[in-house]
Amino acid sequence: MRKWMILLAAVLMLLAGCGKEPAVAGLSDEEFHQYFAEDYARPVSNITEITEENGGLMLKTDLGAPITAMKDGTVAWAADIGWNYGYGRLALVQQEDCYLLYAHCSQVAVKTGDTVKQGDKIGEAGDTGHTEDGIRVGVYRFPLEDVALVTGADGTVSAFTVNGEVSGIGME
């Protein structure tokens, strides 16, 4: 009987270790604020890695994780469909002194013209466009009066220009 009890205890200990791996804790606030000023909130709660690419940052996180506004602003362009020149579904939010780009969303929860407050839902992290799971965040600082949105005949925004030059997003 004692052998069976020891065997049962050993099996139970082995099974206890077969559960799901614990979630990665993610980047600390200190690590996050190496990339963003203190007044910027995290756009997703579980950032596991930040990589710099093409003038923006790729924030690796769980597919479908809620994306929230890093600062207050107005949605200048929201695209919940299409490839959008490799950026996939995206939202471009105008701040007081810059634009914030949230790209590669699995879905976008805002529309062009919406006002967002820091912490409001923008969409969900995805893998649309040319990327892996996560979101791309870009901070574009240029005089806002130099920016023009490019609209089609139906009034939908398809890109933007800075001083007449096509920006890094929206167009090739």
Task: Indicate residue ranges for each PLM-predicted region.
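Acidic, glycine-rich catalytic/binding loops that coordinate metals and/or anionic ligands
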Residues: D120, R136-E172
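Surface-exposed, glycine-biased beta-strand/turn segments
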Residues: G19-R89, Q118, V162, V166-E172
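C-terminal motif of bacterial Sec signal peptides marking the signal peptidase cleavage site
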Residues: L14-G17
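Positively charged n-region of N-terminal signal peptides that target proteins for export
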Residues: M1-W4, G19
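Residue-level recognition of beta-strand microenvironments
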Residues: I50, A78-A79, V108, A125-T128
